[in-house]
Regions:
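Bacterial N-terminal signal peptides
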Residues: 7-17
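Conserved long hydrophobic alpha-helices within structured protein cores
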Residues: 9, 20, 83-87
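Amphipathic alpha-helical segments typified by the pilin-like N-terminal helix
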Residues: 18-54
């Protein structure tokens, strides 16, 4: 007599526990996508700041610290490797030379987290305003362009 309700309860508990996993994974991916949005917005802000800095500084590009000192970026970026949300930003800057009329910069946004809650890796540089994306490792100019 009690076997049927206990069996039904066991089946319901199994179904409930199985449905929690996809829900939790979905929440983790939602957080990663929100962090990606913040990272890509930061890279686009950096690109605008670099173009403005370059126009004011004879074709040279600036480091994070130089961009902050000049008022092109806010204090969140005033570090050699600023961290925004769950991303770390890194930038390389090369000055102009006799062989190169303009300087060069590249900037990466790499997630701090790993596993299913990690976001994608992004890249932008002075040759294009396009964001490049790589799902598993630091992105480069050779990676595909990020689609909105």
């Amino acid at each position: 007599m009690f076997r049927i309700p206990i069996l039904a309860l066991t089946v319901l508990l199994c179904i409930a526990s199985l449905s929690c996993q996809p829900y939790s994974t979905g929440l983790q991916q939602s957080v990663a996508r929100a962090d990606e949005t913040a990272a890509t917005a930061a890279l686009r802000t950096i690109a605008v700041a670099q173009r403005t800095y370059s126009a004011s500084n004879g074709g040279d590009f600036g480091t994070f610290q130089q961009l902050c000192e000049g008022g092109y970026l806010d204090s969140r970026f005033n570090s050699s490797k600023p961290a925004l949300k769950d991303y770390v930003l890194t930038m390389e800057v090369a000055p102009k030379s006799e062989a190169q009329a303009e300087g060069f910069y590249s900037c990466n946004a790499d997630p701090v987290r790993t596993g299913p809650q990690a976001g994608r890796h992004f890249y932008i540089d002075s040759t294009s305003s396009e964001l490049h994306v790589n799902p598993g490792e630091s992105a480069t100019a050779k990676d595909p362009i990020a689609q909105p």
